[in-house]
Amino acid sequence: LKKKMKAVKSLEHRFDREREDMTEFPDSEEAILVGFGEDTAVPAGKTVLDFSLPRLEVSGRGLSQNLRLYVRGPEHVCILGPNGAGKTTLLRQIAGELLKRGDIRAAYMPQDYGETVDQDLTPVEFLAKSWEKAELTKVKTYLGNMKYTAEEQGHAVRELSGGQKAKLFFLKMILDGCNVLVLDEPTRNFSPLSGPVIRGILEDFPGCII
């Protein structure tokens, strides 16, 4: 019996050592420590969008007609529809209208990140407004808070994963203080850990989202 007890104790010690060596995966993306500031709020009575389109089409094929979308204040509007319904085409046109405005700070996050990003740039080059030391330090700190490694910060955007590219868009919108966001499936490339955190950031966003 003593020999058996000694063997059991030895096995317990081995399991304890193995548990210490195991990597524990977090339940949430704790490293994402960024968010939009209060200065991105949109007044409740402000008209953000008064958009009408007689006909929505792609390559000459009609998808819909007599569209009207009116958005006021800090509304969060979701455009739903099956694949091929023209959601992306519609969002591009809405973004085109909003990006021309001087009374709001609009941003557009497309499904295809290459539409609006020079993929030969590094994340630091994409985000930095100048080459001053304080600006570069700020950008690198934000990238670190979004779980970019020092190595990833020096890679070309094209070499990054879809999730890292998506985070780059969010950082750009945050650093630019955008208060109106046009987002085309913004969370589709995020991991199961990052996704809920990003959705929480969007839910708390005090500006307007389409």
Task: Locate the predicted segments by residue.
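ABC ATP-binding cassette signature C-motif
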Residues: 42-210
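Coupling and communication elements adjacent to P-loop NTPase active sites across diverse families
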Residues: 1-59, 72
